[in-house]
Amino acid sequence: LRNGVLRCVGDPGERFREDALRILRALRFAARFSLTIEEKTAAALRENRELLRNISPERIFSELKGILCARGAGEMLLAFPEVFFVILPELAPMRGFDTRRPQNHCWDVWGHTAHAVDAIAPESVLRLTMLFHDSGKPETFRYDAQAGFGRFPGHPAVSARIADAALRALRCDN
């Protein structure tokens, strides 16, 4: 830790199999303290991500809020999307989704979201809002050939529906 590196004691895969919540804790610590996750630990974290399905939603939600409110939240979202998509599969369509609006965004929707999370005050309600604010874009995308760019009719309402369902599944404490 003194060198800014987060690593598991012993075999990382074994540590994550003992308690899968350690996967999210590792991301929270790395985000909060600006740590680099050691290569074997990062690989084991990714390999064991499906074990998060065995963790109670309340515990996942608590760690998710901790990650999102840390100063390195966006970096973790970008570096470990596959982990977040296990706990929030509704957000997976955002990764790699091109809005076809280069005048507004140089990132896909997931990249834009990660940067938006970092750009707002570190309060859980605000960070969760930013996490879900464009989640409806892939579903509502329409390409306007005449205008030469994408449009997203009704995406705020669809994003709100996605957020509501996801946060209920995680038993959000309102």
Name these PLM-found stretches.
Residues 1-131, 135-154, 158-174:
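Glycine- and charge-enriched loop/helix tracts that form the active or gating conduit
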